[in-house]
Amino acid sequence: MNTAALREQIQRAHQHEAETGQLLQQLKIQLPHLHPAIHLPEVDAQGALTRFVTAYIDLVPDLLDAAHEVAIEAGIEGQIRPVLRIAEHFFTAPPDIMQGHEGLDSLLDEAYLAHRLVEEVNDLYIKHFGQPLIPSNTTVASVIAHQVIGEQFANQLDEAVHHAVDQLLDDEDFALDSVEAYREKLSSPDTEAAWKRWPSLSRQLGIGLELERSAG
């Protein structure tokens, strides 16, 4: 995985945002129109939403590195790597539907694609192993990102994700001998220790989850 290039791209987008304030202005416009299910702090709601979007984008390289490493341990790197490469490709060569988007605004769309792709792979792992590829539940964060991006465009991005997964993964990929060996290894005490190598995932998503927990 060439996540170093992704990190550089994200850094450039942060610089673009520092110079233009483009994302901040966009979120300011969107804030009054967000779905009522999304509860933001009464104080500095715009700042909280901006921090959430930034954390959601910044998390992608770590997420892809984690997914790749665990896929190697599972003996299914050959099946998972192409999916992760698509997530990476969403950043380096975005689909045509994202033309005209730039800076952190563009990377939010691309981060959404990457997160949703990993979520779909996680769902397959849960189906076949009873637990996800990586122990990071980004579903709540992606629901919020979906609303920030906008229903119509986010639905188009979801379609791109489903198409990618359908093309690259099926049940036969989880019937390999190496996968059976991994399934047995999941009951090992070492597995829980392995999950704990990625504590920053949930911490970085804390903003997104806090946004939801503040409801009520």
Enumerate the language-model features and the residues they cover.
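Membrane-inserting effector segments that mediate pore formation, membrane fusion
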Residues: 82, 86-116
